[in-house]
Regions:
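Short beta-strand->loop micro-motif that forms the acidic, two-metal-ion catalytic signature
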Residues: 44-48
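Catalytic core of pol beta-like nucleotidyltransferases
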Residues: 1-27, 33-39, 49-107
Length: 107
């Protein structure tokens, strides 16, 4: 990973620790997690929250700050958010399997 990529990862981690609820998880997945990203590659994030269902308010509160951070850094940050229960229901999907295999927990 380049120095710039390490700096971006650190800023994402710090933001997650600042804003996410205590029992939330933040995972990096995709090319940045696999360390095969190109300079123009985006940053794929998975946010896992407690609760029954993700609401529009959850999206605004937990997802938008990461998108905004990407804008300020000139990179694309693409967070997806699920509750732990919703995420477990996706266990049979290739997406779930890929994230669980290659994901890097940031906080």
């Amino acid at each position: 990973m380049s120095a710039q990529q390490l700096e971006i990862e650190d800023l994402i981690r710090k933001l997650g620790k600042e804003i996410l609820p205590e029992h939330a998880k933040l995972l990096l997945f995709g090319s940045q997690a696999r360390d095969d990203a190109r300079p123009d590659s985006d940053w794929d994030l998975l946010i896992l929250l407690e609760g029954e269902k993700v609401s529009n308010e959850d999206f605004d509160r937990w997802v938008f700050p990461f998108i905004s951070l990407g804008w300020s850094l000139g990179v694309e940050i693409n967070p997806v958010v699920y509750t732990y229960g919703e995420w477990q229901q996706r266990q049979i999907t290739p997406f779930y399997k890929n994230v669980m295999r290659e994901g890097v927990e940031l906080c």
